[in-house]
Design a protein with these regions (language model features):
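Active-site-proximal alpha-helix that buttresses catalytic centers in soluble enzyme cores
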Residues: 1-44, 50
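Short, amphipathic alpha-helical "lid/cap" segments that border enzyme active or binding sites
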Residues: 4-8, 102-109
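Active-site-adjacent alpha-helix immediately C-terminal to a catalytic or transition-state-stabilizing loop
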Residues: 28, 39, 105-150
Length: 150
């Protein structure tokens, strides 16, 4: 939590036009610590979830998340958002291939490139972010990234 408080102070002077958060519980908690006041333009986006590789990367269904995090809008999430929307036995881990992860990163880059907002914060995960910036960040470390706007 101390890391999130430090990051909150570092980011306090930035007027973000859009905030994006992964739907994994740990990220929603981190997001809430960094941005404690509700911000109008916040999107919970499954594209920025972690690489599905371990049990900690398995998500929860939107109706369950909504009860725990009522200030977020989960209406754009499908029931099995952490498994590329494919139904599964929730007690199993269907690992995501690196190829599938990279395809998801490309879809995110395409999505971000068509946004009108210029100042965007993305609260996501190490492996996902590393596939964009080509190195790993420490917990609660931030990096400024300039996407290839067309």
């Amino acid at each position: 939590k101390n890391e999130t408080i430090k990051l909150r102070k570092l980011l306090a002077g930035i007027d973000f036009e859009l905030l994006i958060c992964s739907p994994l519980t740990r990220t929603l908690q981190t997001f809430t610590n960094i941005f404690p006041k509700p911000i109008k333009n916040t999107k919970v986006l499954s594209l920025v979830r972690e690489h599905l590789d371990h049990s900690c990367d398995v998500g929860r269904q939107p109706n369950i998340l909504q009860k725990e995090f009522p200030h977020f809008d989960f209406s754009e999430l499908n029931k099995y958002w952490w498994n590329n929307d494919v139904p599964l036995d929730e007690n199993e881990i269907n690992q995501e291939s690196i190829h599938d992860l990279d395809q998801r990163v490309l879809r995110f880059k395409e999505w971000i490139n068509i946004r009108k907002e210029k100042t965007i914060a993305v609260v996501s995960h190490g492996t996902f972010i590393s596939r964009i910036i080509y190195f790993f960040l420490d917990n609660c470390e931030f990096e400024i990234w300039y996407p290839d706007k067309k």
